[in-house]
Amino acid sequence: MELVVIAKPYANAIFELAQQDKSYLQWKMVLDAGAQLLIDEQMCKFIAFPNVLKQDKLSVIKELLKSILARELSGHEVTFIGILLNNNRINALPSIATLFESLINTTNDAKMFNVISAYQLSELEKKQIVRDLTNQYNKVVNIDAVIDKDLVGGVIIKDGDKVIDMSIKARVNELELRLSKTH
């Protein structure tokens, strides 16, 4: 069975739960972190190993997520991971994360930003931008990163017609304008 088909009821259930207390961001972070764990080949082997009890697998995953998220998992989050393990559906976690994000994007509780940079942003830089924008707007934030080598450095963040220009090119243009006014 295709993972998307398996993932859909789980994503819908988590979305309904997140709607109740507006915990979209917390769930998105847990699902994304869980999906990241499953990229690791050793982690996949550990989860697939039949001699390890599911409770032990849950404990390991819980500790790893706690480390990644820098917080304890909620009871609902632990229960959800446990259900995935017990139903042998933990491998659907990346698809669940993707579907959950799609559900969030269809609500008014998400914001999309275009981020233009002079170079390819690292995952850490993208996460920092998302974290900063999330804190500023108090909404789930998604970014679409684009490269424009003319910027030299820095970033431009666009939200519709609103622009936050933190590029070196903008600073040089501003300095040039100031210098031309003084002469």
Swiss-Prot record:
- Bilayer topology annotation: Peripheral membrane protein
Q: Which GO terms describe its molecular function?
A: proton-transporting ATP synthase activity, rotational mechanism
Cite the record's note on assembly: F-type ATPases have 2 components, F(1) - the catalytic core - and F(0) - the membrane proton channel. F(1) has five subunits: alpha(3), beta(3), gamma(1), delta(1), epsilon(1). F(0) has three main subunits: a(1), b(2) and c(10-14). The alpha and beta chains form an alternating ring which encloses part of the gamma chain. F(1) is attached to F(0) by a central stalk formed by the gamma and epsilon chains, while a peripheral stalk is formed by the delta and b chains.
Q: Which Gene3D superfamilies match?
A: N-terminal domain of the delta subunit of the F1F0-ATP synthase
- Where is the major localization of this protein? membrane
| Record's protein name | ATP synthase subunit delta
One Gene Ontology cellular component annotation held by this UniProt entry: plasma membrane
Instruction: Give the matching Pfam families.
Output: OSCP
Give the similarity note.
Answer: Belongs to the ATPase delta chain family.
The protein's superkingdom reads: Bacteria
> From what organism does this protein derive?
Ruthia magnifica subsp. Calyptogena magnifica
Task: List the PROSITE patterns.
Answer: ATPASE_DELTA
Q: Does the keyword Glycoprotein apply?
A: no
Main function? F(1)F(0) ATP synthase produces ATP from ADP in the presence of a proton or sodium gradient. F-type ATPases consist of two structural domains, F(1) containing the extramembraneous catalytic core and F(0) containing the membrane proton channel, linked together by a central stalk and a peripheral stalk. During catalysis, ATP synthesis in the catalytic domain of F(1) is coupled via a rotary mechanism of the central stalk subunits to proton translocation.
Keywords (alphabetical) are: ATP synthesis, Cell inner membrane, Cell membrane, CF(1), Hydrogen ion transport, Ion transport, Membrane, Transport
Which cell locations does it reside in?
Cell inner membrane
